[in-house]
Amino acid sequence: MEKFDVLVVGAGTAGCLAAKTAAEKGLKVCIVESKKRAEIGVKICGDALGEHHLTYLGLEKPQGGELEKRIEGVQIFSPDQNTVFTIADKDFIGYILNRRLFGQWLLKKAANAGSALMDSTKFLEPLFEKGFVTGAKVRNSTGKTFELKSKVVVDASGFMAVVRHKLTGNMNIDREIENEDVEACYREIRQLRQENENTKYCEIYLDSKVTPGGYTWIFPKVGAKVNVGLGVVMRGKFPKPKKQFYNYIMARPQFESSLLLNAGAWWDPTRRPLDNMVGNGVVLVGDAASLVNPIHGGGIGPSMLSGFQAGKTIVEALEKGEPTQKALWGYNNLYMASYGKKQASLDIFRMLLIGSSDADLNYGMNCKLVTEDDVLKAAMGEDFHLNITETAKRVFRGRKRMGFLTKLRLTVKMMRQVGAHYDAYPTSPENFEPWRLQTMKLVEQGKKKLLD
């Protein structure tokens, strides 16, 4: 039976960063991946990555075609498309990736650091011993089933969270998430007849008739290619994403006679982070821990950040002794301080968007109750103030939209409350339960006041 210091389940962006970070410090690391090596990196997503994530992680810009298109920001279209917010800031400068090449680039970095890879190998179940996760049972492409022992197992298996779902209840890790916190997505890569005029910005379209609780995206790729897709919240009786895509998006003139290059569907956990992401001998990263921006659904940057922070924490824990939940707890603190606070606050803003009508959003954007600067500050996790003048109040009262105005004010207030709550994230598991109970209270308040 092979023994490792760290066993990473999943060779995605989070898994490769966790493996690379741990292996660079001399730990014996193995990545288990169900895909063939050549297919690592292939994933259904928007393929966008902010440049600041590479900078923060100390990664140079890859030069082998991994960065397919530079973008300068995001344009958000109101449901009636009469108002467009252009969000252009250094933190919104980024790239549309060649997803497979980028995944291969990260895998190579993990391998060069010393990580081993078992591709075409399926995770079956975690191994337990005396309250610790101590490895995994896996099956390779020949059908052989065997066990791998490790001091720490990292669940980097994405939305399916194959390790998390099989953990025991005494680890205080949520094994399931609500459907209403997930977006069902459908995406295509298409070759247009000619290149779009706007190739500097990623475009986001709000329209509850097309994408209830979600949005449509059109992201420019190299030449006349685009990444186009949509997501709908899995709340109640939600529509099928592919059907919505072909009924509404493909009806646009710009897609007439376009060529389908690639298509696929997947799920995106758009909510706050899991309240706790560590247990004895186990750490959760990336989509497996619901580490995705709740507003735009981007998860590549947060996943890489979490992988790096998890790897760093695992190294420190093993240097000091056993990888207990307490020893690994610092990963929770690192992520919550760097991105989790913002993510949780944006989850409240997501509730506002889901609970608002298209008419409310049209008026709100047109009247500049929420401005481009507000959206930018919210996206960066900064405080912002609503531009609610007496004139705006009269307009909304006259159009019988004071309810939306009230919701907007409440949203800003609750985002601040959630931010302050995450600033007080416990520094050890002993103080976790009271914090978790308060989290649940805030979330339920948000749902009751903004969604219902």
Give names to the regions the model predicted:
Residues 1-14:
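Beta1/beta-strand and adjacent pyrophosphate-binding region of the FAD-binding site
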Residues 7, 23-43:
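Glycine-rich FAD pyrophosphate-binding loop
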Residues 36-75:
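N-terminal FAD cofactor-binding segment of flavoenzymes
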Residues 43-46, 93-96, 215, 289-301:
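Glycine-rich phosphate/pyrophosphate-binding beta-alpha loops
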Residues 89-108, 233-241:
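Short beta-strand to alpha-helix junction loop
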Residues 109-255, 290:
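Predominantly flavin-linked oxidoreductase catalytic cores and closely associated redox partners
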Residues 123, 236-313, 318-319, 325-338, ...:
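FAD/FMN-dependent oxidoreductases across multiple families
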Residues 315-452:
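C-terminal helical "tail/cap" subdomain of flavin- and related membrane-associated enzymes
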